């Protein structure tokens, strides 16, 4: 999954994502593009685009993303794809957002924690495997939606900064032109 913007005027937001696509993806990788700008960009390149989600209705975003994630999970379960990754823009603060590639599946094994003196045997009902089969789709869909929202936050912050910079430049140009006019 690659999450880009639906609108322009957001500075280098999309360019940073495109650069990471070129660095991290090959032509054989299955790609799901989320966002109008990314779909337009990738259509001119040699990538294996499985699906394009653009101009998503705000009320139906989760359902659309959920359906795509379920399709990816089905491919993963059939071993047609080896991993599911999300390329999104991680929001740190208003000025900092970083393109990030996160592997959702397969899940990496957590590092062993030191054993404490207490150990409790857990009884799972239903059994662990059934619980995992039910939880994995729920968790992966939630992760995708969360990354989508984080990317949208980054997009808006980037757009705000670009517009603020454009306004500052326009005011500076106006001041310079006013000075030049008054000298004449």
Regions found by a protein language model. Give the residues of each.
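C-terminal beta-strand-loop-alpha-helix "lid" module of Rossmann-like NAD(P)-dependent dehydrogenases
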Residues: 1-184
């Amino acid at each position: 999954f690659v999450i880009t913007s639906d609108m322009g005027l957001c500075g280098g937001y999309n360019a940073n994502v495109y650069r990471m696509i070129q660095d991290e993806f090959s032509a054989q990788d299955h790609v799901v593009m989320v966002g109008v700008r990314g779909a337009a960009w990738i259509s001119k390149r040699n990538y294996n685009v499985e699906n394009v989600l653009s101009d998503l209705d705000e009320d139906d975003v989760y359902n659309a993303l959920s359906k795509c994630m379920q399709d990816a999970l089905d491919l993963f379960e059939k071993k047609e794809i080896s991993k599911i990754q999300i390329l999104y823009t991680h929001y740190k603060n208003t000025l900092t957002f970083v393109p990030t590639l996160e592997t959702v599946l397969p899940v990496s094994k957590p590092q062993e924690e030191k054993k404490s003196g207490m150990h409790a045997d857990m009884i799972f009902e239903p059994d662990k495997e059934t619980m995992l089969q039910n939880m994995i789709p729920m968790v992966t869909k939630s992760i995708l939606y969360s990354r989508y929202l984080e990317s949208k936050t980054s997009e808006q912050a980037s757009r705000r900064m670009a517009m603020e910079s454009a306004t500052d430049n326009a005011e500076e140009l106006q001041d310079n032109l006013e000075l030049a006019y008054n000298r004449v």
